[in-house]
Amino acid sequence: MIVIIDYDTGNTKSISKALDFIGLQNKISSNKTEILQADGVILPGVGAYPEAMQELIRRGLDVTLKEIAVLRKPILGVCLGMQLLLESSNEHVFTRGLGLIPGYAEKLPDEPKFVIPHMGWNQLENKRITPLTKKVDGEYVYYVHSYYANCPPEYIIATSGYSVEIPGMINNGHIYGAQFHPEKSGQIGLEILKGFKEVIRSCKSSLQ
């Protein structure tokens, strides 16, 4: 069972439908017990970083997510959810994140040829083979964002070109992030979610 974390900041229903489509049992929940009992967790997110982080803290879900990480259960952050996995963001004001992946979120450079927000389809380049990235090289995925993850290169597993090289996917052990929306990215998005399913299966086996 995957729990999609509900904190009133995210596209939970579309992620749930995508998981249903690939036959992955899931539930949308903010209940801490249900989250801790899950085999894996997806942290969605749209909107502004400070408000999203504040809402996680208000509900105590920041602590729950860190407990999930300690339990070595897989986590996938999507869009803003990926940025929340980082150490901090400078969106509007400096805000500490969950600190589960090294790096911070900063605004995309404002250059005449590149519109902000970065919205639409962009091509992925695979930087490291993982269960989530094994089929992504050269594929197009759907982005909507104005901030990006500034991470050490060893945590970046796929990128897209824009005004900077955007980390499209990041990874730290059993914790993954996708800056784009897998649930809106057609067949390749489903393949990425299948890869997360593979990670869950592997982690579950190693913990038994």
Swiss-Prot record:
Give the active-site positions: C79, H181, E183
Q: Which GO terms describe its molecular function?
A: glutaminase activity; imidazoleglycerol-phosphate synthase activity; lyase activity
Predominant localisation class: cytoplasm
EC id: 4.3.2.10, 3.5.1.2
The protein's matches in Pfam families, at most eight in alphabetical order, are given as: GATase
**TM ranges:** none
| GO BP terms | L-histidine biosynthetic process
List the keywords (alphabetical): Amino-acid biosynthesis, Cytoplasm, Glutamine amidotransferase, Histidine biosynthesis, Hydrolase, Lyase
**Domain Glutamine amidotransferase type-1 residue range list:** 1-206
Q: Which InterPro entries match?
A: Class_I_gatase-like (IPR029062), GATASE (IPR017926), Imidazole-glycPsynth_HisH (IPR010139)
Write out the annotated subcellular location. Answer: Cytoplasm
Provide GO CC annotations from the record: cytoplasm
Describe which pathway this protein belongs to, using the record's wording. Answer: Amino-acid biosynthesis; L-histidine biosynthesis; L-histidine from 5-phospho-alpha-D-ribose 1-diphosphate: step 5/9
Q: Which reaction does it catalyse?
A: 5-[(5-phospho-1-deoxy-D-ribulos-1-ylimino)methylamino]-1-(5-phospho-beta-D-ribosyl)imidazole-4-carboxamide + L-glutamine = D-erythro-1-(imidazol-4-yl)glycerol 3-phosphate + 5-amino-1-(5-phospho-beta-D-ribosyl)imidazole-4-carboxamide + L-glutamate + H(+); L-glutamine + H2O = L-glutamate + NH4(+)
**What is the annotated role of this protein in its UniProt record?**
IGPS catalyzes the conversion of PRFAR and glutamine to IGP, AICAR and glutamate. The HisH subunit catalyzes the hydrolysis of glutamine to glutamate and ammonia as part of the synthesis of IGP and AICAR. The resulting ammonia molecule is channeled to the active site of HisF.
UniProt cross-references to PANTHER family, sorted A to Z:
IMIDAZOLE GLYCEROL PHOSPHATE SYNTHASE SUBUNIT HISH (PTHR42701:SF1)
Complex and partners: Heterodimer of HisH and HisF.
What the entry lists under HAMAP family is as follows: HisH (MF_00278)
Q: What is this protein called?
A: Imidazole glycerol phosphate synthase subunit HisH
Q: Which organism is it from?
A: Listeria welshimeri serovar 6b (strain ATCC 35897 / DSM 20650 / CCUG 15529 / CIP 8149 / NCTC 11857 / SLCC 5334 / V8)
